[in-house]
Amino acid sequence: MKDLIDELPGLDLPVGEVTNRLELMWDSDASGSPSAFRASQMNVVLHFGWDVTAEQAQERFSALLTFAQRYPSRIIVLCPSRSIKDGSMRAKLFSQCYIGDSHREMCCCEALLLGYEPDNCGYLANQVSVWLEPDLPSYHWFCGVPSARIEQYSDNLLKGVRRSIYDSSFEGEDLSQLDWLEPSRVSDLALARLLPVRQALGQFLSGYEMRGLCENLDSVILRHSDAMSGEGTRLIEWLRDCLGECEKYDSTALEVKYIVENCDECELEFPLALEFKYSDGRYFKWRKFAKGSMGEIEASLGKSEEKISTRIKP
């Protein structure tokens, strides 16, 4: 089986030559040279674990390159290696320029890839620190790294990191339960993707008084596909927090049932769906369509029955 670093693009180089090659590559004063379009705003470290497949790694690497076109970044990709047994490291260098509608919209980015032995935490942190752009904020994206391993990085690799990132819809563990040194500096991509959903739900429900939304509420049911398990968990947490005031208006609010259901067959039609059930016959339903960037609200909350479309992606 190939190591992940061999599945990603880039030029093989000795680890010690990467920074020198970078300097030579961008060293030009000409106004039309690539260096004129290279102005990094941040460092982004993409950190893979053992069980990440080549396809998953390529997908996330491509996503990060797309991100770097909008927000120029120095990308560092950490790839665990099964072939390295002596503590040594491997390196690759990837660079590419993207041209927009005009030459002025050109953007150049770089990615430094490192193959390493996972047990070598200290040396890994040292090498990453050498590759980081100084004086720029750093973001660390964990992808498939076990929680126990992440904890080992807390006092070396994660020192000085502005934000640690993970995707709960991908991870096999709930990393929100990890003993992070600064939980406020940790972000879940699944929660970030929910922003337009929360905006759509909030905009619609704000047209009703809180008392009316709370009275006779029997259950809140959230159904999700396997691929959107993180969104399901984060959305029900948000709803539970929003409806926490219900006990002020209805003494039975503490009896409201919050139910999360994994729905395999939902994948093809509605991979994420929400329903409020009321004992008096009222209801509120929202669902995300499997294709496209739209969802739909269907409700009967005391006024006339309503059915409207909602945008669920920016």
Task: Pin down the residues of each PLM region.
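An N-terminal, globular interaction/scaffold subdomain
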Residues: 1-140
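C-terminal structured domains
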Residues: 21-32, 40-42, 61-64, 71, ...
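Short, flexible beta-strand-to-coil junctions
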Residues: 49-51, 225, 277-281
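Structural alpha-beta junctions
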Residues: 65-77, 132-139, 158-165, 240-255
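Flexible loop/turn segments at secondary-structure boundaries
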Residues: 85, 147-148, 229-230
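Short secondary-structure transition/capping segments
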Residues: 88, 151-153, 260
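Internal, hydrophobic cores of structured domains that mediate oligomerization or house catalytic pockets
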Residues: 94-101, 105-206
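A contiguous, surface-oriented mixed alpha/beta subdomain in the mid-to-C-terminal portion of proteins
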Residues: 169-172, 176-263
